[in-house]
């Protein structure tokens, strides 16, 4: 039970807007997966409605003389010939109402009672029919009644299978004792009344008459008694009988709930599941509430807690346990609902839980949102937190301090005082809550719960919060109370202190109250909201006068929480009113006599699966079991194994056998004496030990051949029973599968066919492979599978290994050449406050500590230039860059980039430097200054093989305008008008934006007509100034910048600049770029004031180079970027 800070002592569950959801929806009748209906499926409902109508008329007639007089004739006919319908008997009305409800919900015991009644009535009618002296009217009535009874009996017998629902266990003897005692008291009281007001009733008939009215439901014929008392006494006598029945029913319902509530073993199992899987469910701990019942999935790895109210089975939030077993838990719950004839409904499911219920045939509607505080980002600063900040300040000025402790750190006396305060400050008689409240405070089993107290100057506690665990790093609000004398801002102070101290307490998330219709309040208050949204918000504000709809919304939103939606799930909307009432009862807004809310274990029938119960892991006191044992417990081997492929099951069985035999399948490693390549060249006399993965096995009985591969190569090993020292070949085949990693020791030799082999004397398993390798000849043929399981591809595919080695050779060659020229390698920040250094769309992230947006760098240029300003004359960085752009043959969002800067140099110097870097890298990877290109074969132009292309020597150099002019067949230079360039673009069908200048249009023409059509490596120099914001203007050619791009086979490999060192011009250009960024261009660079300030300290004339290493590896190997990267970004399955 909790209260919000709207006013002292307001209940957290004071209205349907409280955290405990009081609106749910259900399915009617049997649910998903229910048994098929026969042609008589309508009989239960028809019987229930018929009996229900009689019960209603009987009750009305018992209290209204007018109604009794109006229906006297049909009532007497029904009573005499069809069904018992006495003139006044409240007790009988109550019995019929219970029977009608039971028939409607298909209870088999109701079918049996109605069938017995019909059989008895038919027998009595048959006896009357056999008697002589009946009038024609009596004969007609008896014949009609007999026919009706026979038809009813036949329908009930034929519809037997439609009444499948059972009744839960209960204290029948105890309820019967209450009924007998109540009837005796009712008879005595009625006898006293009839002695005082006998009317015309004869003295000798008074006791039988009273007994008939109290116990016999007035079913005996009134003509059997001499005289009768006043008609008002008849109603009172029936009321005494009804009260006795009601008390007996209450006792039965109480015993049903108590007997079927959580047992200690049930709670222990739930706590174990929460320990393993509860980190994502903020309401998971409330599943341990002890007046709930529970149903487990058959494998014991998930459970649903629920409560039954007026025939509605309300599931409380998400299933608890392994999300993979949630569907099995839902199936078990629906089967239980069907067994007892309950209508299922779900209250407060999360998005993930609602999806599971939806797949089971339910629909979902959003009820509201749960407020979640993230302690890492919570702060009191900022304009949006002004209200909370002021409230906290007021509370602190009033002398309040906050004390935070675990329940386990609180003494018994202090906890007793805390419980007393919570009860005293509660403004309702009973504790409320069901789906989002624990219903107990200070229980020893809840030692991990957190208690937050507000203490005044006199050390008096004026408010308390109690929060239950949410995984290991979160807490969820359970109790919120404050004294009526507490100062304003008390709750804000407590919540803020808890959030601000979250890191110290190990708390990352705080779940606060639940807010109904939060979206309606927000959307209705927005500027420009439609009339329907405003009307809906107005209605909610109107009802907030009685229920805390807006109050809870306002009390939560001021903390700026994350809103997490919660849902109600249903199958059939026809029973929504009934489920609404059931929800109100479950949450405690409507307190029925049998709604006892237990704090101790009262259940007598554990719901945990038998195998789990017999494992001995669970505790009778409900405490958390040994989680490691629970995790490895073989609860249901068949169900667990049904999801594992056959080959994996076989390998797991082998692993288990090895473990039982004391063999460690994953031992500590010892370096082998030789690699495979070294072993092949080793002397036959020496002992050789190798280790590697088994790729192939050929067993010939006494001799076995296997192929073992390590990083250096592949070797054949030979196992001979005559040579093996410690075991035989049968032991090897029993333990080893393809893919296992083994250690082999022996001598080098030759097989009979002359193959160089290792003759094994001893072997050892050092890594058991639990999944089979792909086809030994084809390997992984699916390109996506090769990307997603690169580790498997490397294990079986030599080509993939060669690509890894080629990439390593390229990186080493580039570094060594730069080192040889006196360059210094540095590392600059990857997380940057401003995205700059290139025009590209960045990846954005956020640092919680500083509450600041950051970007993954798109280039290290601006930081490297800072180093140049500082005097590092030759500097380079070889590292990762990130650009949030497309993914294709030559692009990956994460890539390796080389940037190098040399003082007292220009862009022309880097032409030879870049060419030498690439030629040396190609020689390091391929052995010669060649790169690999696909060879086109056949008329279809299919590229089947790679062929080397010589790239030695000097590469051609062209200006951009010269290359564009050649492609267009018309001269273009810096003086060409924009209109002319647009006409040329239109003629070449190249698109452009209307706001582009001449430089941008020329660049677009270059990209389409020149870059995409270039084959041999070519340097294109002198780009338009407007598209090179960081480049120095050309020293002699106006309108162009000293920049070149290296292009080969349609791919840009690198670029170099004569760097712009004029700080005034640099500021002007970056300012123009920042205006583009403000205007919505996501690729434009932002203004970096720190960099501009550094430039004002003067940078020496510098030439800079940028080169994509991934594309360089692509060029040298002839492969796509996804093939050359060990782990390229892949879309999720």
Curated annotation (Swiss-Prot):
GO MF annotations in UniProt: ATP binding; lysine-tRNA ligase activity; magnesium ion binding; phosphatidylglycerol lysyltransferase activity; tRNA binding
Q: Which CDD domains does the record match to this protein?
A: LysRS_N
Question: What are the TM regions of this chain, as residue ranges?
Answer: 43-63, 82-102, 109-129, 140-160, 177-197, 233-253, 575-595
Topology relative to the lipid bilayer, per the entry, is: Multi-pass membrane protein
Location of region: Phosphatidylglycerol lysyltransferase: 1-626
InterPro entries on file: Aa-tRNA-synt_II, aa-tRNA-synth_II, aa-tRNA-synth_II/BPL/LPL, LPG_synthase_C, Lys-tRNA-ligase_II, Lys-tRNA-ligase_II_N, Lys-tRNA-synth_II_C, NA-bd_OB-fold
The annotated region (Lysine--tRNA ligase) lies at 627-1133
> EC number(s) per UniProt?
6.1.1.6, 2.3.2.3
Q: How is the cofactor bound?
A: Binds 3 Mg(2+) ions per subunit.
Q: Where in the cell is it found?
A: Cell membrane
> Which reaction is the catalytic activity of this chain?
tRNA(Lys) + L-lysine + ATP = L-lysyl-tRNA(Lys) + AMP + diphosphate; L-lysyl-tRNA(Lys) + a 1,2-diacyl-sn-glycero-3-phospho-(1'-sn-glycerol) = a 1,2-diacyl-sn-glycero-3-phospho-1'-(3'-O-L-lysyl)-sn-glycerol + tRNA(Lys)
Please provide the record's keywords in A-Z order: Aminoacyl-tRNA synthetase, Antibiotic resistance, ATP-binding, Cell membrane, Ligase, Lipid metabolism, Magnesium, Membrane, Metal-binding, Multifunctional enzyme, Nucleotide-binding, Transferase, Transmembrane, Transmembrane helix, Virulence
**Keyword Transferase recorded:** yes
Q: What exactly does this protein do?
A: Catalyzes the production of L-lysyl-tRNA(Lys)transfer and the transfer of a lysyl group from L-lysyl-tRNA(Lys) to membrane-bound phosphatidylglycerol (PG), which produces lysylphosphatidylglycerol (LPG), one of the components of the bacterial membrane with a positive net charge. LPG synthesis contributes to the resistance to cationic antimicrobial peptides (CAMPs) and likely protects M.tuberculosis against the CAMPs produced by competiting microorganisms (bacteriocins).
* Family designation: In the N-terminal section; belongs to the LPG synthetase family. In the C-terminal section; belongs to the class-II aminoacyl-tRNA synthetase family.
Entry protein name: Lysylphosphatidylglycerol biosynthesis bifunctional protein LysX
Species source reads: Mycobacterium leprae (strain TN)
Q: What is the lineage of its organism?
A: Bacteria, Bacillati, Actinomycetota, Actinomycetes, Mycobacteriales
Q: What is the primary gene name for this protein?
A: lysX
């Amino acid at each position: 039970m909790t209260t919000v800070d709207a006013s002292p002592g307001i209940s957290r569950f004071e209205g349907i807007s409280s955290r405990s959801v009081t609106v749910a929806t259900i399915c009617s009748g049997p649910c998903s997966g229910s048994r098929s209906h026969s042609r008589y499926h309508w009989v239960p409902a028809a019987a229930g409605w018929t009996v229900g109508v009689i019960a209603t008329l009987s009750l009305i007639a018992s209290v209204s003389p007018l109604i009794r007089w109006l229906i006297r004739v049909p009532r007497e006919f029904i009573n005499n010939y069809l069904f018992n319908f006495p003139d006044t008997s409240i007790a009988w009305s109550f019995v019929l109402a219970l029977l009608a409800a039971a028939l409607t919900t298909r209870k088999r015991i109701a079918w049996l009672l109605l069938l017995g009644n019909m059989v008895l009535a038919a027998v009595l009618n048959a006896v009357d029919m056999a008697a002589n002296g009946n009038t024609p009217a009596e004969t007609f009535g008896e014949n009609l009644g007999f026919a009706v009874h026979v038809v009813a009996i036949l329908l009930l017998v034929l519809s037997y299978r439609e009444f499948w629902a059972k009744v839960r266990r209960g204290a029948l003897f105890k309820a019967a004792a209450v009924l007998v005692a109540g009837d005796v008291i009712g008879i005595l009281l009625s006898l006293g009344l009839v002695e005082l007001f006998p009317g015309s009733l004869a003295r000798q008939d008074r006791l039988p008459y009273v007994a008939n009215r109290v116990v016999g439901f007035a079913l005996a014929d009134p003509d059997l008694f001499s005289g009768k008392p006043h008609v008002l006494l008849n109603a009172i006598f029936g009321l005494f009988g009804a009260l006795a029945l009601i008390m007996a029913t209450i006792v039965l319902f109480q015993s049903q709930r108590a007997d079927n509530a959580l047992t200690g073993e049930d709670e222990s199992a739930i706590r174990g599941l929460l320990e393993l899987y509860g980190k994502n469910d903020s309401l998971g701990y409330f599943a341990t509430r002890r007046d709930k019942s529970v149903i487990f999935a058959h494998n014991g790895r998930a459970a649903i807690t629920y409560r039954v109210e007026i025939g509605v089975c309300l599931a409380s939030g998400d299933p608890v346990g392994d999300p993979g077993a949630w569907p099995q838990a839902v199936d078990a719950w629906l089967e239980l609902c069907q067994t007892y004839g309950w209508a299922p409904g779900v209250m407060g499911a999360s998005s993930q839980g609602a999806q599971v219920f939806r797949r089971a045939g339910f629909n979902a509607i959003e009820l509201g949102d749960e407020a979640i505080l993230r302690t890492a980002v919570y702060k009191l600063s900022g304009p949006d937190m002004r209200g909370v900040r002021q409230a906290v300040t007021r509370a602190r000025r009033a002398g309040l301090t906050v004390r935070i402790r675990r329940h386990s750190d609180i003494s018994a006396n202090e906890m007793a005082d805390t419980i007393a305060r919570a009860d005293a400050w509660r403004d309702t008689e009973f504790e409320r809550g069901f789906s989002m409240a624990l219903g107990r405070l200070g229980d020893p089993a809840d030692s991990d719960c957190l208690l937050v107290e507000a203490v005044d100057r006199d050390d008096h506690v004026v408010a308390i919060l109690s929060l239950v665990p949410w995984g290991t790093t979160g807490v969820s609000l359970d109790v919120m109370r404050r004294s009526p004398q507490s100062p304003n801002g008390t709750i804000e102070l407590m919540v803020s202190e808890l959030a601000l101290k979250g890191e110290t307490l190990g708390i990352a998330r705080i779940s606060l109250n639940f807010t109904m219709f939060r979206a309606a309040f927000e959307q209705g208050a927005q500027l420009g909201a439609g009339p329907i949204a405003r009307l809906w918000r107005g209605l909610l504000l109107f009802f907030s006068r009685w229920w805390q709809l807006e109050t809870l919304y306002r009390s939560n939103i001021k903390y700026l929480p994350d809103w997490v939606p919660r849902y109600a799930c249903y199958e059939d909307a026809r029973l929504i009113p009934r489920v609404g009432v059931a929800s109100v009862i479950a949450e405690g807004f409507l307190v029925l006599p049998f709604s006892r809310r237990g704090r101790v274990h009262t259940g007598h029938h554990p719901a945990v699966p038998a195998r789990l119960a017999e494992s001995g892991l669970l505790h009778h006191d409900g405490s958390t079991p040994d989680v490691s044992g629970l995790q490895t417990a073989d609860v249901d081997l068949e169900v667990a194994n049904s999801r594992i492929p056959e080959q994996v099951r076989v390998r797991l069985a082998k692993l288990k056998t090895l473990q039982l035999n004391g063999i460690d399948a994953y031992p500590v490693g010892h370096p082998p004496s030789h690699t495979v390549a070294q072993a092949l060249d080793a002397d036959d006399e020496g002992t050789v030990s190798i280790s590697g993965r088994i790729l192939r096995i050929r067993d010939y009985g006494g001799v076995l051949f296997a192929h073992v591969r390590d990083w250096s190569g592949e070797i054949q090993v030979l196992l001979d029973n005559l040579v093996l020292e410690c075991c035989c070949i049968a032991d090897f085949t029993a333990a080893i599968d393809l893919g296992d990693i083994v250690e082999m020791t022996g001598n080098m030799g030759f097989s009979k066919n002359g193959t160089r082999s290792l003759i094994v004397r001893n072997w050892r398993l050092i890594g058991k492979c639990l999944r089979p390798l792909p086809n030994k000849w084809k390997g992984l043929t699916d390109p996506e599978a090769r990307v997603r399981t690169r580790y498997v591809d490397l294990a079986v595919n030599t080509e993939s290994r060669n690509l890894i080695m080629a990439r390593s050779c390229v990186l080493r060659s580039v570094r060594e050449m730069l080192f040889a020229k006196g360059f210094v390698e540095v590392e600059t920040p990857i997380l940057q406050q401003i995205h700059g250094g290139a025009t590209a769309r960045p990846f954005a992230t956020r640092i919680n500590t500083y509450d600041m947006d950051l970007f993954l760098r798109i280039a290290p240029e601006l930081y490297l230039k800072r180093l140049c300003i500082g005097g590092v004359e030759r500097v380079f960085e070889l590292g990762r860059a990130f650009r949030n752009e497309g993914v294709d043959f030559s692009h990956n969002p994460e890539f390796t980039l080389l940037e190098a800067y040399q003082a007292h140099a220009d862009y022309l110097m880097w032409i030879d430097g870049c060419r030498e870097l690439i030629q040396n890298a190609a020689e390091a990877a391929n052995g010669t200054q060649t790169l690999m290109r696909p060879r086109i074969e056949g008329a279809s132009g299919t590229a089947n093989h790679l062929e080397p292309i010589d790239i030695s020597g000097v590469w051609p150099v062209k200006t951009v305008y010269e290359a564009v002019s050649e492609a267009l067949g018309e001269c273009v230079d810096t003086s060409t008008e924009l209109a002319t360039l647009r006409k040329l673009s239109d003629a070449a069908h190249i698109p452009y934006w209307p706001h582009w200048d001449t430089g941008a249009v020329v660049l677009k023409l270059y990209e389409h007509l020149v870059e995409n059509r270039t084959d041999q490596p070519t340097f294109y120099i002198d780009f338009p100034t407007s598209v090179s914001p960081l480049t120095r203007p050309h020293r002699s050619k106006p309108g162009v910048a000293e920049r070149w791009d290296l292009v080969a086979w349609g791919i840009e490999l690198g670029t170099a600049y004569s760097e712009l060192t004029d700080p005034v011009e640099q500021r002007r250009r970056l300012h123009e770029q920042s205006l583009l960024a403000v205007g919505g261009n996501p690729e434009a660079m932002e203004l970096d004031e720190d960099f501009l300030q550094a430039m004002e300290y003067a940078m020496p004339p510098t030439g800079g180079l940028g080169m994509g290493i991934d594309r360089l590896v692509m060029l040298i190997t002839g492969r796509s970027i996804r093939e050359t990267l060990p782990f390229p970004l892949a879309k999720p399955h």
